[in-house]
Each structure stands twice: as C-alpha cells, then as structure tokens.
Amino acid sequence: MISGLSNVNIELTNRCNKSCWMCGRRKIEKDYPDLLQEGDMDFSLVELLAKEVPPRVVIQFHNNGEPLLYPRLGDALSLFRDQVKCLDTNGKLLVKRISEIIDNLDTITISVIEKDPEGDEQYEIVREFLSFKGDRKPIPIFRLLGDVPSERWAELGLIAFRTLHDPLGSFGYKKKVVLPEIGICLEVLHHLSINKDGLVSACVRFDPQGEGVIGDLNKETLEEIWNGRKRALFLSNHLNGLRGMTPLCNRCEYWGVPTG
C-alpha cells in the first residue's frame, strides 16, 4: 500500500526549448554535459505509472524539461483518469498543443521569469491560448519568479509569487525561506519525483548528481520504492532532526513550503 503520498512529479521529457538565465540546467550543460542526456520518457513507462500512482494524488508532469515538448502529450495525460493533473510550462507551445491540453489537465502553471527578453511574446501567447480555451480546464496559474511586475498577469488568472535561489540548488534564496510548523520537510513526507528513465527521487529538488535517488521503476514497483529502505533512511533522518546527514538535504534550504 502507498500511504501518505500526495504529489508526484513525472518528467515526461528533460528536453527544453528555452534558455532561462537563472536555471541550473545551463550550468550543467556547460560544465557537466555528460550528466544531461536529453530524451523523453518511454510511453510504456508512462502507462505503468498511470496504473501505479494512487487515485487523487497530484501529478505534475514536469521536472527538468519542458513538458509540452513530449511527442505524445495528449495520450499521456489521458491515461491518468483518477489523479489531479497539473504541469508547469514556459508557454511557448501552448497554442500549438492546445488540443491536447484543453480538458486534459486540471491546472496549468506558466512560469514567468525576471528579466526575460521573451516576456512580452510569452504574454501574447498566453492571451491567445486563454481566448481559445475560454472557461474550459485547465485553470491557469502564473508563477512569477523573482522581480516580475504582476499587474497584467493578475488580470489573466491566479498569481503564485516565488523568490529566486541559486541555480545549482535550493539554497541562496533571495528571501528567508518558510519553514513548516512541524519542523519536518514536507517534500520528504509526501512527495516523489520520477525522471524520464524511471529513477525515483525522494523530492523534486535540482539534483544532477542523483543524490536523492531512492529507487528504479525498471526494477521495483512504486509501492516497493515508497516503502523501501532508502526512502525510510531519508525519512528517519528528517524525523530525528538529522537533515544534515542526508547528502542532498545537507545543503538544501527548502522545507516543502514555497517562498514568495
């Protein structure tokens, strides 16, 4: 049984069609190109996940790539009938993939970044998408990263403010991070991330070295990984105030509560 899981990030692809100045991906591409082998998730793995992820779990179809680049996007989204379906996009392909998006997601988040030279173009694409979509799902959310004027975006939908941090990980935040009252990282308690190759991580933090990997769906079921020894060690360290004993967590400042 999978008990306590609330969110899963599924990386349909790690390919991207935008070069965001504050993205850690740029650093990896330049200094460690061998760590970033671009590609898409095999559709058979998507089919497997549709069967193994429990009902009513929130699925976010993104991680280190642009999900709208996935060739069989509409087919993939349609497989998950009993889960809450969301994704985060830069918006470039919203109009092109609109027939696969409308009524096939619950929410869609458009990331709007500080000092983006393509900002005005992005805004016009979003407006065109929304005019076609009308009142149908998905519900749009605009994730403003850094110092982004919010007025025009607020007219289009919900706003989620986010502060910037170091490109190489969840540290060096521009604002003080928010801690949960229970003092335990909510990501470790309730979250999983699955990359395009089927490697499962304990959270969705930027992790090019794979320090947070706790299982492989090519060898184990999602239930076995969730209840397995590696995740249990992550969880035990956090429950016992030993966050610093876990390699990925010892430099991370994020506690599962977004900072705006």
Question: How should these model regions be labeled?
Answer:
Residues 1-107:
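Conserved alpha-helical substructure of the radical SAM core
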Residues 62, 111, 206:
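Conserved residues at the C-terminal ends of beta-strands
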Residues 63, 187-189, 221:
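A conserved catalytic-core signature of glycosyltransferases
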Residues 70-183, 187:
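Conserved AdoMet/S-adenosylmethionine-binding subsite of the radical SAM
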Residues 132-176, 205-256:
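C-terminal accessory region of radical SAM enzymes
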Residues 194-195:
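Short, acidic, Ser/Thr-enriched surface-loop or helix-capping motifs
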Residues 1-37, 51, 204, 221-260:
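N-terminal pre-core extensions flanking Radical SAM catalytic domains
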